[in-house]
Amino acid sequence: AVGIVMKAVPVRTTMNILECILIDATTNVIKFTGNDMELGIETIVDGEILEKGKVAIEAKLFSEIVRKLPDSEVTITTDSNYTSLITCENSKINIAGKSGDDFSYLPIIDKDKMITISQFKLKEIINQTIFSTAPNDNNKMMTGELFEVSENTLKVVGLDGHRIAIRNITLEGRADDVKVVVPGKTLQAVSYTHLT
């Protein structure tokens, strides 16, 4: 879960909180979230919540700690100063955290306006069109791809000023018409991430 969320943690930022992973156990599930304000990834992990709460922990350090822990049960306990104790078998690590309230949450998506497409098909579409997006920010619109749904057809268009790639597929079921430009960085992350 941490490795997936790390894809959305920026390498450099002026907002220190974005260098963190949010661990949110305020509901009945444990959510790990990374967000660089352009790409946000949230993943849900199984676990037992003894006391509800949330904390933002420096992502790179947390990722290194988790990677080196044995494949066993991990317990995270956070005090009122957001210092977190990570326990796994004989390992105990204290790490400074920050208030989870300061973390930039992901937008809430209206599930009434969604399309359903297989993970394989989505990755295939991205891989067949992403090469024709612009690599720099001179024109923001060209660094992403147009996703257009019209009459139950999804059209994906990548354009960099010299090349164009278009892919059309028919969607199952009924879908509302919509046009949205998805940043290339986001599409690259989706293409390389195992989704569930």
Write out the residue ranges for each language-model feature:
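Structural preference for solvent-exposed beta-strand-turn elements
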Residues: 1-195
